[in-house]
Amino acid sequence: MSKKMFGEIMRQAQKIQEEIQKKQEEVKKMTVEATSGGGMVTVQANGAGEIVSIKIDREVVNPDDIEMLEDLVLAAVNEAIKRAHELAQSEMAKVSMPFNLPGMPDLSSLFGKL
């Protein structure tokens, strides 16, 4: 491999790294939403998978049936985290796609966790 070719590969690697960092910051600012109980519980998560908001409709709050509320919150939280993970993978794949070369591993697998 010539020095010129190696230099070009290094420039490409630096460009990829910069694009990945930029996209990671963008993804962290994105949000997804999930609901359960027909919209009685709504959870929002950011692209990093952090829960940023939980809203519970008053009608679902029953002191005699806390277990149902817990189940609804758990279901909505799990779905929000799943959607945040899917969002992050989808967005990061957009960055890695142009740089996937024949014979090179798929880079999108590196972005499962932000």
Curated annotation (Swiss-Prot):
Any one cellular-component term (Gene Ontology): bacterial nucleoid
Pfam families the record matches: YbaB_DNA_bd
Keywords, comma-separated and alphabetical: Cytoplasm, DNA-binding
A molecular function (GO) term: DNA binding
Locations listed in the record: Cytoplasm, Nucleoid
InterPro entries membership: YbaB-like_sf, YbaB/EbfC
Family from the record: Belongs to the YbaB/EbfC family.
Database matches in PANTHER family: NUCLEOID-ASSOCIATED PROTEIN YBAB
Entry protein name: Nucleoid-associated protein THEYE_A1069
Organism for this UniProt entry: Thermodesulfovibrio yellowstonii (strain ATCC 51303 / DSM 11347 / YP87)
